[in-house]
Amino acid sequence: MRPVYITRTSSFMPNDPVQNSEIEEYLGMIGGKPSRAKELILRNNQIKTRYYALDKSQNVTHSAFDMAVESIRSLYGDRINENTIDLLAAGTASQEMIMPSHGVQIHGQMGGERDMEVVSFAGSCCSGIHALKYCQMAVSSGERSRAVAVASERFSAWMRASFFNDEYESLSRLMEDPMIAFEKDFLRFMLSDGASAVLVTDKPNENGLSLKLEWVELTSYANTMPTCMYAGAQYEG
C-alpha cells in the first residue's frame, strides 16, 4: 500500500458574512413574524456569523456545485489543475438535482480536457468524509495518484420562509423537549452554505506542509439509533 497525503486544502464561502441579527433578512420570516425560538437556539449553538448563497430578496446566488468548483479551483497551481486530477469524489447532503449526481455536476462545470473517475456520496454530516475515504483508498491502492475530495452544501434555499407552513413550536416546548431541536425552526438557525476541498496525493509536498493520512474509519449506528435528521419524507419513527 502506498502512503497517502493531504497536500492542499481550500474552501469557498459565498457572499459576505451574515450576522445573527440579519438571518431573517435573508431567509425571511415565517408568517411575517420573527422567530420566538431564534435567541434560544443561537445562544446554545454559539454561531456568530454564517454564509448564505442568497441575497436579501431570497434569490439564490450560487448553487452547491458552483461553490464546490470554486473551492476546487483554489487548489490549482504548480501543475495541479482540471487536466491533472485523476479522481473527483464529492459529498453533499443537499444535492440540488436527482440526476445527474452531485460529482458529475461539479465535473461538468470544472471543464477541462481530462476524463476522470467521479463518485458521489450523499447523507447527513458524513458525506464529505466518505469522499475523503474513497480518495484515500484509491491513492493507497495505487489506482490513482492525484485525487480531490470536495464537500459542498446549500441549505439556505431549503430554509427560506416560503417553504415553511405558518406554524411554530412554542418556546416552552422547545426548552422541555430536546427532540424539538431537530424540528424546523432549529435547523433554520443552524445550517448555512459553503464548500471545502482537499487534494490527496501519493507524495508529500516538496515545500510546505503535508498531512499523512493513515486511516479513515466510518461506522453507522442506524441499526440501533433512531433517525435524527431527514428530508423528503414524513418520518414516523
Residue ranges and their predicted role:
Residues 7-8, 91, 122, 147-153, ...:
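Short beta-strand segments
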Residues 158-180:
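Short, flexible helix-coil linker/hinge segments at the edges of structured domains or between repeats
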Residues 71-86:
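Phosphate/pyrophosphate-binding loops at sites that engage ATP/ADP/AMP, CoA/4′-phosphopantetheine
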Residues 18, 99-101, 133, 158-163, ...:
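Short acidic, glycine/serine/threonine-rich loops at helix termini
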Residues 86-94:
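Short glycine-rich or small-residue beta-strand-to-loop segments that form or flank ligand, phosphate
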Residues 38, 42-52, 60-65, 93-146:
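Conserved catalytic cysteine-centered active-site region
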Residues 1-61, 174-237:
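Condensing-enzyme catalytic core mediating Claisen C-C bond formation in acyl metabolism
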Residues 143-165, 221-228:
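Acyl-CoA/ACP chain-elongation machinery
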